[in-house]
């Protein structure tokens, strides 16, 4: 039989992608499978996640606002899609594996509880330990496929597990998602806060305006561009010192004025109570 489309794609990766990129042909699964003629392992992982029930359930899970009025506030699903797009752009700029990036980005938050992080914290206080990234891996390895999971590649599972916390993903693609996730949620939560009239543009710290910009579009563009040029030909993904400091200031501002604000305190109480009752 002549060369399959998958084999051609795998071959092209070695000539087209950076030497530092993860290669589909080298990806490992816990259980061996018959290869697809069309799709690489990472492409199949992405499709398995996208078509899964856990991913579809993300549309009912909110980010910050438990019961927002209107259709334009973000959910875990829209967040995951935004993370995927931001991170693919970065990956393309660095000639890394976009299929691996997309799979990690789409699957990174499926383990989240309802009601945002207050749901996660409440469940952890009840059962003793709960981390949404660990639950995401648990879903893909045990809680689907009649106990067999989806048999995703080690590279995808590693990126999902280490997208948050102190651990560093072993692939550059996973490292992109780790930072890209933060870029996405800070910017879209800021946008949602403006829509909810919790904030005004004038409230932004001066250093954030100066370095990152005033609008979500400007902020995303600044951080994505900086991340690409700061990480070029590097063995790890990073932001420049100036942009990283501005991002930290932006994050501190969002926690103080939005995530932990008195305005959302009642919503957090409601979410906590519902999880405790369940």
Describe every region a protein language model picked out.
Residues 92, 111-115, 124, 128, ...:
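Amphipathic alpha-helical interaction elements
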Residues 99, 103, 116-129, 195-197:
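Post-HEXXH active-site segment of zinc metalloproteases
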Residues 61, 112-119:
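Short, conserved acidic/polar surface loops in the N-terminal third of protein domains
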Residues 102-107, 179-180:
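Short alpha-helix carrying the canonical HExxH Zn2+-binding catalytic motif
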Residues 107, 111-112, 184:
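Short active-site segment of divalent metal-dependent hydrolases/proteases
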């Amino acid at each position: 039989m002549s060369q399959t489309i998958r084999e051609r794609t795998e071959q092209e990766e070695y000539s087209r992608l950076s030497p530092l990129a993860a290669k589909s042909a080298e990806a490992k699964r816990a259980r061996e499978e018959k290869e697809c003629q069309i799709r690489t392992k990472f492409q199949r992982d992405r499709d398995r996640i996208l078509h899964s029930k856990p991913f579809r359930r993300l549309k009912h899970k909110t980010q910050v606002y438990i019961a927002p009025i209107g259709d334009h506030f973000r959910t875990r699903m829209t967040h995951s899609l935004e993370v995927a797009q931001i991170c693919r752009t970065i990956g393309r700029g660095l000639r890394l594996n976009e299929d691996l990036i997309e799979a990690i980005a789409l699957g990174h938050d499926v383990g989240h509880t309802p009601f945002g992080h207050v749901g996660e914290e409440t469940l952890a206080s009840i059962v003793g330990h709960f981390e949404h990234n660990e639950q995401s891996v648990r879903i893909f390895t045990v809680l689907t496929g009649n106990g067999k999971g989806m048999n995703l590649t080690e590279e995808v599972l590693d990126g999902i597990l280490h997208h948050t916390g102190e651990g560093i993903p072993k692939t550059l693609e996973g490292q992109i998602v780790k930072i890209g996730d933060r870029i996405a949620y800070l910017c879209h939560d800021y946008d949602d806060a403006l829509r909810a009239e919790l904030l005004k543009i004038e409230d932004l710290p001066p250093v954030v305006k100066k370095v990152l910009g005033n609008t979500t579009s400007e902020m995303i563009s600044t951080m994505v561009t900086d991340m690409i040029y700061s990480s070029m030909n590097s063995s790890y993904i990073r932001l420049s010192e100036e942009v990283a400091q501005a991002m930290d200031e932006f994050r501190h501002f969002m926690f103080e004025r939005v995530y932990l604000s008195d305005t959302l305190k009642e919503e957090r109480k409601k979410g906590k109570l519902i999880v405790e009752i369940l």
